[in-house]
Amino acid sequence: MFYCCGITNKGNRDHNEDALMIHKAYITEGTLEEHIPSPFIAAVADGVAGEQAGELASSLCLRLLSNIKYNHTTDLKERINDVHEVLVQYGLENGAYLNMQTTLCGVAIDENDRITTFNVGDSRLYRYRNAMLRQLSRDQSLVQLLYEKGTITNEEKRTHAQKNIIFPVLGNIHNAPQIDIHSYGEKMQYGDVLLICSDGLSDYVSSTEIEEILSLPRSMAKRLKMMSDLSLEKGSKDNISIIAISYYDDK
C-alpha cells in the first residue's frame, strides 16, 4: 500500500494555476490524502503564467490523465502526448483558450510496484532516501541548459534573470513538447519518499531545507505545510503544490 498526501494553494497570487492529482482524484486548492494500492499515477501540473487560462490547462490536463487505466504495458509517452493534443485542439476550438499550456511532472507506479517517472517543463520530482534528497527529474528550462553548459552554477539557477524561461510544454501550439520518461525497474524502499512539486516550492526552498523538513517527526501533511509556509516566508510569488508518496506494508 501507498500513502499519498498532497497540498496546493494559490500562495501570494489571486488565483491558483496549479493542480495536483493522486490516482483518480485531482484538486486545485486544499489538501488531498489517499491510502491506495498500486497501480496508480500521481502528478503536479503548473499552468503557464502569461498564456491563456493556465488554470484550465492544468486542471484539464490532470482530468485527462486521471482517466488513464495504468499498468506496466501502458505507453505513458503516447498517453501524455494524447493529453497535449487535446489541450491544443481545445484551444483551437475555443479562441479564448488558444495556446493554454501547462507543465506536468509525476510518477506512475505499476501493479508490480515498479516506478516510472515523467516530466514536461520545470516542475520537479525528488526521491528522499536515507536522509538524502535526490532530484529525479530534469528541468526543461533555459537555466538548466546554461548550467549543463557550465555557464552558471547550480546556486545561480534559482536567482538567474531568465529562470522562468522553459521549453515547450503541454498545449503549446507552435512546438511539440519533449516528454521525458524514465523507468527505474525498482520498487520503493521502506522510508523512501517521492516528492513532486511545482516551482513555487523548488525556486525558493533548497534541497537541504526540504531534507531537514522531511526528517522531522511530524505528520506528512504538517511537513508539506511547513515547506509551503517556508516558501512564502522566503518570498515565493507563485502558486505552491506538493505531493509526497511513501510505501508501507499493510499485511
Residue ranges with predicted function:
Residues 1-251:
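PP2C/PPM-type serine/threonine phosphatase catalytic domain
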